[in-house]
């Protein structure tokens, strides 16, 4: 999980550490300039986040993407819609460790029992469990419903409207 792990998986087995470092540096330089290429929010997501905010609920992003990429994407695609965003950075272990979630909860001074984790991958299922939070998995993102359920998801929504119903209950 995370960019470094992606680089390790992308190069041939046995690649020297110095080359992995160079590949990581090259990727990072490229990604900083192009992280939003061919990216867009799923239909209905901005409206979902607006509904959540209009209900007086804090909104946040936790991601294994590099923190600079998370900040850029939130600013470009969701200006003013997230109260906090945290990506991969020093001092915070990547998901499925709950570190990023715990940071968000501390930032807002909110108890985990009053929060809902929304995710689209098996790593998100694990992260929510590790954080001791209710989870709303979405079936239109990185993984489909069947895969999510095979990997521990108990409940999967199929639209932003269904997600809002789950969050708003």
Question: Model-flagged regions — what are they?
Answer:
Residues 95-125:
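Conserved Lys-Pro-Asp/Glu-containing loop-to-beta segment of HAD-superfamily phosphomonoesterases
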Residues 63-65:
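Conserved phosphate-coupling serine/threonine residues in phosphotransfer and NTP-handling enzymes
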């Amino acid at each position: 999980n995370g960019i470094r792990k992606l680089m390790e998986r992308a190069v041939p087995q046995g690649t020297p550490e110095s080359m992995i470092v160079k590949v990581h540096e090259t990727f990072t330089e490229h990604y900083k300039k192009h992280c939003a290429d061919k990216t867009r929010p799923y239909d209905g997501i901005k409206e979902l986040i607006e509904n959540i905010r209009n209900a007086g609920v804090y909104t946040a992003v936790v991601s294994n993407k590099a923190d600079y990429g998370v900040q850029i994407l939130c600013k470009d695609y969701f200006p003013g819609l997230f109260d906090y965003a945290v990506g991969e950075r020093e001092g915070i272990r990547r998901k499925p460790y709950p570190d990023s979630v715990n940071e968000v909860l501390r930032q807002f001074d909110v108890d985990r029992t009053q929060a809902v984790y929304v995710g689209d991958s098996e790593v998100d299922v694990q992260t929510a469990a590790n954080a001791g939070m209710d989870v709303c998995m979405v079936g239109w993102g990185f993984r489909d419903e069947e895969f999510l359920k095979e990997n521990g998801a108990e409940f999967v929504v199929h639209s932003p409207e269904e997600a809002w119903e789950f969050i708003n209950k």
